């Protein structure tokens, strides 16, 4: 009886171990994203593409701002999310490196540093630059001859009526408004800014278009779709303040080893995404109010990535 019990226990223990290993093998890939329009779009692109290839996912899209999502990745609370090459300069502590001003060089540097330090893998980026920018209402820009941030600096110094809608992240991060103000020698007073909850440029652009609380300028991204339609003009950045922000999927090494097909699934998709394409897709969400998941699915089907 004792021998039987021991054997039974060994069989049971083996079964439990096998079940545990099986659960580990099939545990879903947890995909997060930031809360901005493009973050939601790209997060859903990743979810739908992996699901269509038979990889189970847990949708954590629209998780939070850059700090929240990055912290979740490093803590192992999510497995992957779409990030931007230019953010590597600030996440990895090498802001002065000129590599960040070039898409490929910035990508290779971020890929190397993040893997060495954190075992985070950067998959291939899109050929697009979603850099931070400042956009001004066209009527204001035309009336005051504003084409570049040098012109904005002159206008602000001359007490021109200027009020910027932006996210708290853009206002506070050293590579956001502080970088523009330092490079172009202007300083906005508190009453010249309107901080909007979240980080979505759809809200900041609309605030400028609708003159909300006197706003006539907005934090914007290089791949924002509705700028022209809503009558806003991006101010040129002749001093090249901003790094190149090319979107790329980031994934924990452990998760990629668990599902090595992820790289071959996502690489051709991200390579198909250029600036004009992202502008069009973002516009469907920001202007037409379409659901990011629907827009992502429509794009993937139109290119034959999913059925």
Q: Can you name each region flagged by the protein language model?
A:
Residues 28-46, 62-65, 169-172:
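Extracytoplasmic "Venus flytrap"
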Residues 158-237:
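Ligand-binding pocket segment of bilobal, Venus flytrap-like solute-binding proteins
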Residues 27, 38, 169-183, 260-307:
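An extracytoplasmic/periplasmic, membrane-proximal ligand-sensing/linker region
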Residues 65-66, 76-89, 106-107, 167, ...:
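Beta->alpha turn/N-cap motifs
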Residues 37-56, 178, 182-184:
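Short, polar/charged alpha-helical segment
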């Amino acid at each position: 009886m004792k021998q039987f019990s021991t054997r039974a226990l060994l069989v049971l223990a083996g079964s439990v171990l096998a079940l545990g290993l099986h659960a580990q093998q099939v545990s879903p890939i947890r995909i997060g994203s930031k809360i901005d329009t493009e973050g939601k779009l790209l997060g859903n692109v990743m979810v739908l593409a992996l699901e269509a290839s038979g990889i189970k996912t847990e949708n954590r899209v629209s998780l939070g701002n850059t700090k929240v999502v990055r912290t979740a990745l490093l803590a192992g609370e999510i497995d992957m999310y779409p990030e931007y090459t230019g953010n590597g300069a600030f996440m990895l502590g090498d802001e002065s490196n000129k590599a960040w001003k070039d898409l490929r060089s910035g990508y290779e540097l971020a890929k190397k540093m993040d893997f060495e330090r954190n075992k985070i893998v950067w998959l291939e980026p899109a050929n697009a630059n979603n850099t931070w920018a400042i956009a001004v209402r066209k009527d204001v820009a035309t009336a005051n001859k504003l084409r570049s941030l040098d012109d904005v600096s002159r206008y602000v110094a001359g007490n021109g009526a200027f009020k910027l809608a932006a996210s708290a992240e853009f206002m506070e991060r050293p590579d956001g408004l502080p970088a523009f103000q330092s490079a172009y020698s202007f300083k906005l007073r508190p009453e010249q800014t309107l901080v909007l909850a979240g980080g979505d440029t759809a809200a900041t652009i609309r605030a400028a278009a609708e003159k909300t609380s006197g706003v006539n300028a907005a934090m914007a991204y290089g791949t924002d779709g509705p700028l022209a339609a809503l009558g806003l003009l991006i101010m040129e950045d002749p001093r090249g303040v901003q790094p190149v922000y090319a979107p790329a999927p980031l994934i924990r090494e452990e998760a990629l080893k668990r599902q090595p097909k992820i790289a071959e699934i996502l690489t051709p998709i991200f390579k198909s995404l250029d600036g004009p394409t992202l502008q069009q897709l973002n516009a469907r969400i920001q202007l037409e109010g379409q659901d990011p998941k629907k827009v992502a699915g429509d794009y993937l089907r139109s290119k034959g990535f999913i059925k």
